[in-house]
């Protein structure tokens, strides 16, 4: 693996040291995606494995955040996150407004642009919806991690931000091995 992957591992380890964080999603506690391997130095007690139920996962993430936790919720590809758009756009993004700023949940969402090498998974797993989501969301910042040096500061910002916003961090699957 390359420096891009190493920085993701470092960022995940940093996030795991905060008592409020919990890593949730498909293949966070069991091997299944490249994102799973970035949790190699994260305690199993910080991981909550979920079934393939993307909308439920986003709803659970919102609920955990409303209870004071900071879920780091994994959607290995944008194409999976599309299935949670209702919860994302109509709930998580609007909680601050609907509660008259009484609630400001903090959720860190990891997603990725699928890798094409060494095996191309075809169009279902290669989407990059970064710009579309930026247009849809008001209280959720979307950050695409184009460069290795962007990774740690972006995840640190997501954890430490005080502006009441959640964060979607978009990784490049091909960069895990190439950068």
Predicted regions and their residues:
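Thiamine diphosphate
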Residues: 1-179
């Amino acid at each position: 693996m390359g420096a891009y992957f190493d920085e993701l591992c470092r960022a995940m380890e940093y996030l795991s040291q905060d008592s409020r964080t919990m890593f949730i999603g498909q293949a966070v506690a069991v091997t299944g995606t490249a994102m799973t391997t970035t949790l190699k130095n994260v305690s199993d007690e910080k991981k909550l494995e979920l079934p393939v139920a993307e909308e439920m996962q986003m709803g659970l993430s919102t609920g955990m955040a409303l209870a004071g936790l900071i879920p780091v919720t994994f959607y290995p590809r944008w194409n999976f996150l599309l299935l949670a758009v209702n919860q994302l756009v109509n709930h998580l993004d609007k909680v601050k407004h609907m509660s008259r700023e009484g609630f400001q949940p903090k959720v860190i969402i990891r997603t990725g642009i699928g890798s094409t090498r060494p095996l191309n998974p075809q169009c279902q797993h290669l989407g990059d919806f970064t710009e579309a989501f930026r247009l849809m969301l008001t209280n959720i910042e979307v950050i695409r991690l184009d460069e290795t040096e962007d990774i740690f500061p972006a995840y640190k910002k997501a954890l430490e931000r005080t502006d009441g916003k959640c964060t979607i961090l978009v990784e490049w699957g091909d960069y895990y091995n190439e950068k």
